[in-house]
């Protein structure tokens, strides 16, 4: 974590992570590591990446266009509900957006290891010298290592995209929340996770997830 935090050692640290991935194999190699096109587009970038894992091409602009949210995304960003609506529209009803609040790390681990899907999360991102007043962020968890006490995150933010980040599980869990402005009310999402799966796959229901399309 300290190596990533320090701008002087960050590039070396990222090269070491990349080397490790080449040796052991990166998780979900079929999934595109997407860079968000603006500071507002972390949600659309995550949807683009999750669809890429399924072999479906969508764009971040297409996500925003499907919601007619060009002004909204710059003002308050996109909610999980918005991402679900975009998934339904761009997937033409062939894919389902499942979500679960108040999740556990074990839920993420089960989805990755048993069901073999990457997991979207809504959390308080860590940007270091790029920090701004709103740290609400979307990323994709690609690996959970209980023994090592860390997880790997595909982060679309420009400084971290391309190589999955490595964060301590405890550190991530403390930041696994976000707030959203919905109809004038501020609502807090706690430990929100989500996946995009083909229509007809109902295993997310076994984990207490709900369809959000």
Residue ranges with predicted function:
Residues 43-46, 79-86, 104-108:
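Stable alpha-helical elements in mature extracytoplasmic
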Residues 101-158:
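Active-site-adjacent substructure of cysteine-protease-like catalytic cores
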Residues 49-53, 57, 86-90, 111-114:
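Structured segments of extracytoplasmic/periplasmic soluble domains
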Residues 1-77, 146-147, 199, 203-213:
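Active-site-adjacent structural segments surrounding the nucleophilic cysteine of cysteine proteases
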Residues 78, 87-100:
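Mid-length scaffold segments of soluble, non-membrane domains
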Residues 2-9, 71, 132-133, 144-213:
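Noncatalytic regulatory segments and standalone regulatory/sensor domains
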Residues 56, 92-93, 117, 209:
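Short aromatic/hydrophobic-glycine micro-motifs
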